[in-house]
Amino acid sequence: MTAGRLLHLLRAPTGTPSAGPVPASAACRGPPHRQLLRFRHGPAGMRRVPVSCTSTTSERKEGMTYKDAGVDIDAGTELVRRIAKMAPGIGGFGGLFPWGDEYLVAGTDGVGTKLKLAFETGIHDTIGVDLVAMSVNDIVTSGAKPLFFLDYYATSKLDVDLAEKVIKGIVDGCTQANCVLLGGETAEMPDFYAEGEYDLSGFAVGAVKKDKVIDGKNIVKGDVLIGLPSSGVHSNGFSLARRVLEKSGLSLSDQLPRNDGITTTVGEALMAPTVIYVKQVLEIISKGGVKGLAHITGGGFTDNIPRVFPSGLGAKIFSDSWEVPPVFKWLQQARINDLLETLMM
């Protein structure tokens, strides 16, 4: 497993062979620098939960946080808490609407300040994949199959060639998610955005039978936690990543070694498109036993994993259970204190 993942929980059948998934509390192979990460869903919190890390290495030194980069996750959580008073149905990864014997499951998202790196690197053909991924990965956590997607593209002055590249990426993302690009909105707003820049939002709708909804309520002690690998940073934490880049003195064109021995540039590593997990997750669901799914995005492990737990349950994860991609190692050199909460770790 690698850092950054969509996590799902399976009930471990009696006599599960050791070659298969192991309980998160079991010993895992890896380097001696082990951290035991504990995540718990308490009765009071919808997202924020206590976290403890026990490490055999020295205590963490003071370092950079997401808030230092201008993003206050606590403020976002407080806004969700307030909105919940007006719209009690929110709080899941996707919103469920009853429709006959099914639920329509909807989600909306953007790609944040990853757009800034797209402008700086000139990589625009995959940002649309990121946009689709952020919404469809949310709705598949309920077991829903994505049906269609809509996009919103806004800019000060429409560059047709640039917009075509972006929308081609959206079409590619929809193909990966096996859904239809049903429509969208192109908004040209003079003087609102900087020249050559644009903003994106996406909206996905899927469906799942009411008796097939995955909501985590049947998770029990002893269930197994499984992670699916990411391609890198995906589409969260880029305000912090850009701050690290600024302070490191590196440029987006500098070389960054990969685990497979091949080198890539820092810009290419950061711009790697978000994995669309729809097909592999639906295939796993079809085999039975999946009780809960979490899409690890903003808030990282600490906020997203407990969202699928019944009150009072938690998870133990050994941090040496996966191979960390080089881009995370590079970011960690900046002594990011809240990596688990910011960058899908």
Please give the residue ranges for each predicted region.
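Helix-biased detector of long, well-ordered alpha-helical tracts
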Residues: 2-345
